[in-house]
């Protein structure tokens, strides 16, 4: 019988669709990358999700985040993403967590219940903690490296963290993961050299912050404000979603 996933099933088969439907994926960070991960995965038939983010939609998110519209500004990102996912598939199980994952609250999450973990957060401390906890639990994880300060979406690659180059965030991650004894980590990274922001615009963002009331990560509190465009983080998110689908459903 035809259903909303029939076109996907034509490509991957019934058994793969059943595996995807029975899988629970945790997405940490529902922003420019994570939002597109969720979008592609729910459209691919993943049956259950945990969404983790404590931030609210900001007007400055409209240039790149799939959850950002004029109507959603000021709303929690996880609330908006959940509503969108249920509109796509009313039967999907979506659990939301309005918090920012850090080593201090890592014990609040039981990673063993996840079939796959997506790291789409920005901070190194959180990324390292996610990788360590995922690998301890024996759950596959994929991490996004830097998607800001980029203009060429064609330069994204999938690789082990220790085979990455150019990306400044990947360099830091290689160093920190090596200290922790982590042997491997699948990542999506870009080999495009970062583009420096126009300094007057970066200063303007800090001094004229328009983040919504109650936002946890205001411009005034950020050390760096990277420039971004719609098509780069979206591409990274779609590549990550493809890796998750292949690993969970197709096994390639």
Language model regions located:
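N-terminal charged helix/coil linker that caps or initiates catalytic domains
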Residues: 1-26
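Glycine-rich phosphate-binding loop and adjoining beta1-alpha1-beta2 segment
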Residues: 46, 51-89
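Conserved SAM/SAH-binding loop
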Residues: 98-106
């Amino acid at each position: 019988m035809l259903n909303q996933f029939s076109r996907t099933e034509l490509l991957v088969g019934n058994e793969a669709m059943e595996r995807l439907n029975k899988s629970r994926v945790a997405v940490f960070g529902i922003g420019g990358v994570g939002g597109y991960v969720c979008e592609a995965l729910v459209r691919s038939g993943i049956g259950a999700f945990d969404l983790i983010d404590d931030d609210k939609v900001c007007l400055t998110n409209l240039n790149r985040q799939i959850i950002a519209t004029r109507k959603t500004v000021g709303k929690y990102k996880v609330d908006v993403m959940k509503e969108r996912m249920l509109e796509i598939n009313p039967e999907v199980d979506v659990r939301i967590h309005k918090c920012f994952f850090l080593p201090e609250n890592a014990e609040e999450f039981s990673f063993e219940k996840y079939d796959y973990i997506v790291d789409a957060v920005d901070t190194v401390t959180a990324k390292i903690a996610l990788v360590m906890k995922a690998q301890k639990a024996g759950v596959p994880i994929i991490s996004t490296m830097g998607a800001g300060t980029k203009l060429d979406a064609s330069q994204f690659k999938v690789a082990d963290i220790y085979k990455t180059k150019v990306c400044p965030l990947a360099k830091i991650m290689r160093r920190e993961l090596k200290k922790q004894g982590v042997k491997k980590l699948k990542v999506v990274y870009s080999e495009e050299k970062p583009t420096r922001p126009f300094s007057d615009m970066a200063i303007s963002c800090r001094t004229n912050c328009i983040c919504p009331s109650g936002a946890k990560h205001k411009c005034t509190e950020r050390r760096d404000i990277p420039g971004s465009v719609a098509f780069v983080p979206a591409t990274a998110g779609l590549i990550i979603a493809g890796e998750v689908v292949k690993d969970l459903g197709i096994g390639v």
